[in-house]
Amino acid sequence: VREHSYIPNLALVQTCQPGGNAHLYDPLDGADAVPWHNILHHSAPVVLHAGAQDLELMQLCGGALPQTVRDTQIGFALCSPHLAVSYAQLVEHFLGISPDKSQTRSDWLARPLNAEQRSYAAADVELLARLYPYLVAELRRLNRLDWWAEENAALLTRQTRPREPWQWYRLQGAPQLRAGDRRVAQILTEARERLAAAQDLPRRTIMSDRQLIAIAQKQPPTLEALAEYLSENHPLWQELPYLSERFAADTPPPAQPSSPRLSHTRRQQYEKLCRYVADTAVDLNIHPDLLATVRTLKHYCANPSADSPLLHGWRAAYLREELQKLL
């Protein structure tokens, strides 16, 4: 749960062994400690759906990542054109039933959990355990279990990388910012991030993206000018020393992120590759972005001598020859 905090709060852990019943572990109840060692340190895969945040919590609360994971959203993307299928859609596809959604927005940090919440949480993992063999069978039929293992290994690798600081260009409305706006936006974004992390607050409770963008577009050149747009008791003033230092520094505006520029010839090759990827994805019955994103293709066309994920793993079998032929 991340509704009221900067760091996600673990509200409940649900597990279900194949053929067994669900077990609910309450991390907010000291008498019912989560068996992290059993969950994280065994050879059987931990099955998740859209599990990036689950993995973040495992690392944060359990101190480690599982040895092996199997993300069912990734697995279904490898055997269908649906890049990000929802849990409910997955259950409906394999089991032909509509899972209960009544407790999705429930307050999972409130205690005690009611019977409806506990039943909902148990069904959540029991249905996942039931559909998992069907997904495995479909991937085995398509000879794509190795693809799934590769994509899940990449998911674990991404979780071990340092988290990138929140940057101005991730703000809602960032594309409309001009150079002078971007300097102020970056300063305010950094100050907001520092305060949110220090006090474990959601960014939006300190300052919404919309408010931040509006102030940045005024381009206050100094801290004194910024004070015209922030109330005296605004929480961002808790970062006064940092704000003072950053406004006093004569730093140029951050550059606008841009995609590589392609020559006329490279542009033609890029367009051919996009068409090839789209056609190949249709043949494989997967989403084109799973095979190769536009960004990855463009970077490859701009610098074909550089290493690329398109030249490794299961993608290489479908892309390497075409990439080398065109470029």
Which residues fall in each region the model found?
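Conserved RNase H-like, two-metal-ion catalytic cores of nucleic-acid enzymes
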Residues: 1-89, 93
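Accessory DNA-binding and partner-docking regions appended to nucleic-acid-acting proteins
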Residues: 115, 131-327
